[in-house]
Amino acid sequence: MYASQHATDHPDRPCFIMANTGETVTYAEFEARSNQLAHLLRSHGLQPLDHYSIFMENNSRYLEACGAGERSGLHYTCVNSHLTASELAYIVDNSESQVLITSRELLDIARDALPDCPNVTLCLVVDAPTDSAGASTAIPIVDYATAVGGQPTTPIDDERLGTPMLYSSGTTGQPKGILRALPEQPPGEPLALFRFLSQLWRYRDEMIYLSPAPLYHSAPQAAVGLTVRIGGTVIIMERFDPVQYLELVERYHVTHSQLVPTMFSRMLKLPDDARNRYDLSSLETAVHAAAPCPIPVKEQMIEWWGPIIIEYYGATEAIGFSACDSDEWLAHRGTVGRMMAGELHVLDDDMNECPVGTPGTLWFSTPTRLEYFNDPAKSRESSSADGSMSTVGDVGYVDDDGFLYLTDRKTFMIISGGVNIYPQETENLLIVHPKVADAAVFGVPNADLGEEVKAVVQPAEGIEPGPDLERELINFCQENLSAYKCPRSVDFEVQLPRLPTGKLYKRILRDRYWTDHTSQIS
C-alpha cells in the first residue's frame, strides 16, 4: 500500500471510501497519514525487520496502519478481529510484535490480551475513550490520532519496503505465521507479484474496487494493496451485506471486486426484485477464492453477471497458485484452474505420483523449505524430507488438460469402514438446498465403522429445524450422492462458525463430538 507517486500526480483522487459513512480519504491524505505513523513507529524504536500487529475491524485507519509498515521495512500482522483475548495474545506474542494497533470497539479484548504480550511496549487505539489507560496493564495505551498528530507528513529518511507477516486462518489448528523476506526493490518500484496479479485480475488505472471482506485476511490485503499501487479507488464495506453490496456497485460504478462463495450464495438467495433492482453493468472483473464454490452456485453467478468471474487457488503460505476464467471453468466445471505459479505434485501417502484423476495430497516444489515463524515442528511436518516440496494438506486431483480440482483438506477426511470420504462434496450439495443457509459435514465416532458421516446445518431464515427437515435433507443427499457419502444424521445450529473470509471453522464443530474419543484423522 505504497502510493507516493499517486499522491503527487493525483493528490485529490479518492484513495478509499468507507461504505457506511461515505468518509473519503484522498491519495494525498493517505500518503501523509501513512508517513506520520511510519515516523511514530521509528521514534518508538522499531527498525527494519521488526514486527507490529493490527487488531481492528474495517475502519478508515486500517489501510494507513498497513501502509506505514510497507514504507518502513517492517513486518506487520493483521489479526482476525473476531478472536478472543487469549487467541489475540497468542498471535501478538508469537509474532514478537512490539506495537499493537487496535480500536475503541476492540479495546477491551486487546487490554485483556496485553499482559500475555511481553514484547509489546505501546498500544495505539483508534478513537480511544478518555479512560482507556486501565490499571490492568503497565503498557501505555494511547489514542491513535493524538500519537500520530504531531509527526511529520513527509517520508522517513530510511524508507524501505515492508511486508505483512500473514497467519494461517487456524481452522485446522493453531494459527501459523508465514514470514517472508522483505522485498529488495526500492519503494514505489513495481513488484513482480503485483504485475502478475494486475494482469490476471485485469486491474487498471482509475478502477473502482469494492472490498466486501475483512481487511485482516490476506486476499483482501493483496487486492486492496494492488488497487492503491495502481491508483484506483477502494470502496471498503465495514461488513458484507448482500443488498448493500449490489447498491454500492451501482452507486460507485464499481469495476472490480473480490468475493467468497458464501457471498455469492447470499446474493443468489435474495428475492428476484432485490437482485434485479440494481445496475451492475459497470462490473468488469469479479474474483473469488478462499473456499470451494459449489458448482450450481458458480453456474448461477456466471449466468447472472456474465463471464467476468475469475477463480484462483492459493494458500496463505504462497507455495502455489492456480487460476481460471469463466470460459475455462465452464469447460471444466468445478476446477480451480491451471497452475500459474509453482510446480504441483499430486502424491499418495507413500509420496508416489497419483495418476490423472486420482485424488492425492497437493505438494508444491519450492526453492526454499517452507518455514512457519517460531514453529519448527510444523515446518518439518509441512515439508518433504529433503525440503524440496511443501504442502498445506489440501487434497485434489488434476484432469487430462492439467486443470486442478480440490477435494478437501486431508485433516477433514472421514475414514468410515476403511473407505476414505471427502466431505466437501456433501457440503456443496447441502448448501444449494433451498432450506439450508449453511452446512458442515465431518466424521463422528461410530463403534463399528470408526467414523460415520455427520451433517450440521444452519436452516434458512424461517425454516423450522427438526426430524422432518433432517429426513428431507438425508433423502436429498441420497438422491444425488453415493450412499457412503451421505450423512447418517443431521444436527442443527442457529449459526455455523464460518469466518467472514468464507472459511468454515469446522474444527470447532467436529471437536464437540470427539470429546471422549480419539479421531482417526490427525
Residue ranges and their predicted role:
Residues 24-28, 163-191:
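Conserved AMP-binding A3 loop
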Residues 2-26, 130-133:
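AMP-dependent adenylate-forming
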Residues 83, 89-90, 100-102, 247, ...:
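AMP-binding/adenylate-forming catalytic core of the ANL superfamily
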Residues 15-59, 63-67, 84-89:
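Conserved AMP-binding/adenylate-forming core of the ANL superfamily
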Residues 43-44, 64-67, 71-147, 157:
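Structural core segment of the AMP-binding/adenylate-forming
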Residues 31-36, 149, 178-204, 265-269:
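Conserved structural elements of the adenylate-forming
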Residues 186-212, 216-256, 270:
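Conserved AMP-binding/adenylation subdomain of ANL enzymes
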Residues 161-166, 229-230, 254-259, 270-332, ...:
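Gly/Ser/Thr-rich phosphate-binding loop
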